[in-house]
A protein has these predicted regions:
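Short helices/loops that flank or line small-molecule/ion binding pockets
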Residues: 77-88, 104-105, 171-175, 236-238, ...
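Conserved N-terminal structural module of periplasmic/extracytoplasmic solute-binding proteins
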Residues: 2-15, 21, 25-100, 269, ...
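Conserved C-terminal helix/tail region of periplasmic/extracytoplasmic solute-binding proteins
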Residues: 363-418
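Glycine-centered hinge/linker elements that transmit conformational signals in sensory
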Residues: 170, 213-247
C-alpha cells in the first residue's frame, strides 16, 4: 500500500547530509575495510538521493563505497529471487509485507539492533518487520509509516469528539443535499479492506491472531470472531442510514471531498497535496473509537539485508549500515522525507514540521501493521467483499452473514495453499 511519489527538497537533503557527516560513526582501521569494499543497494528513484548521502556519510569513516542502484520498485522482490549472486544486492528497500515471503525463502537475514536503538521506535513499527514461525526476529529497519486517517473539512464540520458525534455530523450533512454523501470512504465493486480497516478494528475485528511466542498464526482467523460479530449489527445500521455506501469508489470519494460534497474523507498521506490545496481548512485525525479504538492498518517501508551480503564479504557492514546507522533519527528524517511519509523513528517524528504529515503520523498511533505472512494474500478480496455486500444499500447482506462467509472462504483458501 505504500506509494512513493514525492521527493525530498534539496534544502532538506543538504541539511541532512551535514548532520550525517557530523554523526558518522567511528571507523575501524582502514586495513579491515579497504577502499575497494563496496555495498550494493537496490532502491527506487525517489529514495536514491537520500540513500546516496546516507551511505556516503557512513562509508567515509569505514572505507566503504555505496553502489546505489535504481531498480524498478515493483520488481525488487521477484528479481531478488532470480538474480545471480554476482549481480545481487546486499541491501534492498521494500515494504514490510514482503518480509514473510523473503524470510521464508532465506533471502533476507535477521538484524540485531542495540536495545537503545530499538527503544527509539514504537513497538508496532518493529513488529511490522518481524517474522518467524516459532520466534519473531527483526528482518528490516523500518523508516517510514503510512496509514489512513479521517480528513475533516473544518468549514463543514468540526473534529468529532466521539463516534456518535461523527455519525451525527456526517448524516446531518448528507441530508442537506442529494449531492452530498455522509462519508467519503472508498470501496467500489471490488471492495477496499485497507481503507475500511479502522471500522473493522473499531468493532473488534482482526485478521490473524498470534501464537504464545508472538508470531502471526494464520490458523487463527479473526475476521468473524465472536466480539466482532457481536458488534456487527452496527454495520447494518450504518448501511440503513447511509453512513457508509460501498458504491463510493476512490474517485468518487476524493471528488466528493474536494468539491465539498462530503465533510469527512478516509484517506492517506499520498493525498497530502490534495488536502493542502483544497481551498478550505482541513484537519486529519484518527477515526473516533467505536467499541474499541479505531486504529488503521499500517504500511511500513524499510531496508533489509540480503543473504548475498555475506557472500560478498560485506555481511557485517550491511547489518551495521541498516541495523544501526539507517535507524538513527537523522537518517530516518531523510529517508522518510524522501517519499513524504512520517518517520518510524520517534525522535525523527518529533522534528516533522509539515502539519498534514504530522497529523497522519498521529492518526497512525497504535496502528496494526498489515500482516506480513504470505497467507495475507488470501484475505484482501474476501474481507473487502464482505464490506461491499454489507454496505451496498438496498438488498445488502447482513454483516454477520457477510463476514462469517468471508472468514470461511479465507480459511478454505489458506488450507488449500491459496
Amino acid at each position: 500500500m505504500l506509494k512513493m511519489h514525492t521527493r525530498l527538497g534539496t534544502v532538506l537533503l543538504a541539511a541532512v547530509a551535514v548532520a550525517l557527516l557530523i554523526l558518522a560513526p567511528g571507523a575501524p582501521a582502514a586495513r579491515d575495510h579497504p577502499s575497494a569494499t563496496q555495498i550494493t543497494i537496490w532502491v527506487d528513484n525517489v529514495q536514491k538521493p537520500a540513500v546516496d548521502k546516507i551511505v556516503d556519510a557512513w562509508g567515509r569513516t569505514r572505507g566503504v563505497t555505496g553502489n546505489v542502484l535504481i531498480h524498478d520498485f515493483g520488481k525488487i522482490r521477484d528479481d531478488l529471487k532470480t538474480v545471480k549472486a554476482e549481480n545481487a544486492p546486499d541491501i534492498i528497500v521494500g515494504p514490510h509485507d514482503w518480509v514473510g515471503d523473503l524470510a521464508a525463502n532465506g533471502l533476507v537475514v535477521p538484524l540485531f539492533p542495540k536495545k537503545a536503538v530499538k527503544a527509539q521506535f514504537p513497538g508496532y513499527a518493529l513488529q511490522s518487520f518481524s517474522y518467524g514461525t516459532t520466534t519473531n526476529r527483526l528482518y528490516g529497519a523500518p523508516f517510514a509509516l503510512e496509514n489512513v486517517g479521517l480528513a475533516v473539512n473544518l468549514r463543514l464540520a468540526h473534529v468529532p469528539k466521539s463516534f456518535a458525534d461523527f455519525e451525527k455530523q456526517a448524516l446531518a450533512f448528507k441530508r442537506k443535499s442529494s449531492d452530498n454523501i455522509a462519508l467519503a470512504v472508498p470501496q467500489g465493486s471490488g471492495g477496499d479492506a485497507y481503507h475500511m480497516y479502522p471500522f473493522f478494528s473499531g468493532l473488534g475485528g482482526y485478521v490473524f491472531g498470534r501464537t504464545k511466542a508472538g508470531t502471526l498464526n494464520a490458523k487463527k482467523i479473526g475476521v468473524a470472531n465472536k466480539t466482532f460479530l457481536k458488534n456487527a449489527s452496527l454495520i447494518d445500521k450504518w448501511n440503513r442510514e447511509g453512513l457508509i455506501n460501498s458504491k463510493v469508489d476512490y474517485g468518487t470519494a476524493k471528488n466528493a471531498f474536494v468539491k465539498q460534497n462530503a465533510a469527512f474523507w478516509i484517506t492517506g498521506p499520498w493525498e497530502a497535496d490534495t488536502l493542502k490545496t483544497a481551498g478550505f481548512p482541513v484537519r486529519v485525525v484518527q477515526l473516533p473509537k467505536i467499541k474499541f479504538r479505531s486504529v488503521p492498518f499500517l504500511g511500513v517501508q524499510g531496508f533489509m539485508v540480503t543473504k548475498f551480503a555475506a557472500g560478498h564479504a560485506v555481511g557485517s557492514l550491511a547489518k551495521d549500515l541498516v541495523g544501526d546507522y539507517m535507524m538513527k533519527s537523522v537518517s530516518q528524517r531523510a529517508l522518510a522525507g524522501a517519499n513524504g511519509r512520517f518517520p518510524a523513528n520517534k525522535i525523527a517524528g518529533k522534528s516533522v514540521t509539515d502539519s498534514i504529515l504530522k497529523q497522519f503520523g498521529t492518526a497512525g498511533i497504535g496502528g496494526v501493521p498489515m500482516p506480513n505472512i504470505p497467507q495475507m494474500g488470501s484475505v484482501w478480496s474476501d474481507l473487502g467483499g464482505a464490506w461491499v455486500k454489507a454496505t451496498k444499500g438496498a438488498g445488502a447482506t447482513s454483516a454477520r452473514n457477510a463476514f462469517t462467509a468471508a472468514a470461511r472462504a479465507i480459511a478454505s483458501k489458506i488450507a488449500s495453499g491459496g
